[in-house]
Amino acid sequence: MFTRNVFTRRSLLAGATALGGASLLPGIAHAKGSLVATTYPGTWEDAYRSIVVPLLKKKDDIDLEMAPLFAMDQIGKAKASRGAPPFDVFVLDPGPRIVAIQGGIFEKFDGKKLSNLSKIPDGFADDWGVCVSAQVVGIAYNPKKVPAPKGWTDLLKDPWVSRLGLTGFQTTFGTSSIIELSKQFGGSLTNPDPGLAELKKVLPKIAAVGLPAAMPGLFQQGQCDVMYTNTQTVATLKGKGVDIEFVKPESGAISFYTTMHIAKGTAESANAYKYLDLVVGKDVQEALMKAPYNFLPVNKDVPLAPDMPMKNLDEMASYVQHDWAKINPLRAAWIEKFNKEMAK
């Protein structure tokens, strides 16, 4: 019975996507002991299917169905579902999280329902959800090809610029990196133009310009030897035998947090809290930190791996963070400008 119900629900989700909306989704019911949670395609999906799905079944007898969707696709489907959420739990980065809060698609969150609340740093749970993974963004480089860059401006100088892999504002790490680069040339949180102008000057020298998802492959293939990225990507490539190291820029590494949220109108709130409690628990966080997944944990009882860029989670409070409420309204125009001016 359960398999049929969830399969039908996901089939309708896929069908609604093909038809350009999720209007077919209202009224789909869960089987007892089930939960549908979104996940990011790729490493997130692989990790959660391998680790979290079986653990949740074993611990709480909940059948977890993963729906792989990028952040804005999650929000779009939830808004189109007209109050009958196609899934019960979202996973989002800072920018989309604010869009979703403004769109009213989350249930209010009660962190006291998590038995592991005391195991995560203060402020990692709020009225809307809980942080489940940390991200640290800086510069990756091939130590056999180029010396370690010291800061963002080095990326526009020799020998780094001719080996640079450049990507735009489509991702959180790309947006954050270009903002920090722009600050070195007089730009600001809401004005990346000075940085874009400098990039345009050296564009003919840049090794590769591509979509964010393509950058790890380009680096692995040797088509670029320097890029801005997160520690998870660096650890994953290193695990594949790629010559790659991570450096924190002199002006500071960037940090942000990936959060999970309970969908407004879900009938599976109790199961959702059990799922979130498991995700931030020591066992899951420790398993996710290991290769080949290389997540940065949020549970204070999990010792950080030696190759992490900090000794403990408290250090991240000193890292650069951005106000996505100010970035979001401007980001679409930035993406358009980058795609127009930086295409090679």
Predicted regions span which residues?
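A bilobed periplasmic-binding-protein/Venus flytrap-type ligand-binding module shared by bacterial periplasmic
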Residues: 138-145, 180-183, 257-269, 276, ...
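Mature extracytoplasmic/periplasmic domains
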Residues: 263-322
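Early extracytoplasmic/lumenal segment of secretory-pathway proteins
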Residues: 32-94, 98
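Periplasmic-binding protein-like
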Residues: 135, 197-202, 240-264, 300
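Extracytoplasmic ligand-binding site segments that recognize negatively charged/polar headgroups
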Residues: 42-49, 86-223
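Short beta-strand->loop
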Residues: 107-115, 127-130, 226, 242-254, ...
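N-terminal secretory signal peptides
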Residues: 1-7, 11, 15-24
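A ligand-binding cleft/hinge motif common to bilobed small-molecule-binding domains
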Residues: 95-101, 220, 225-243
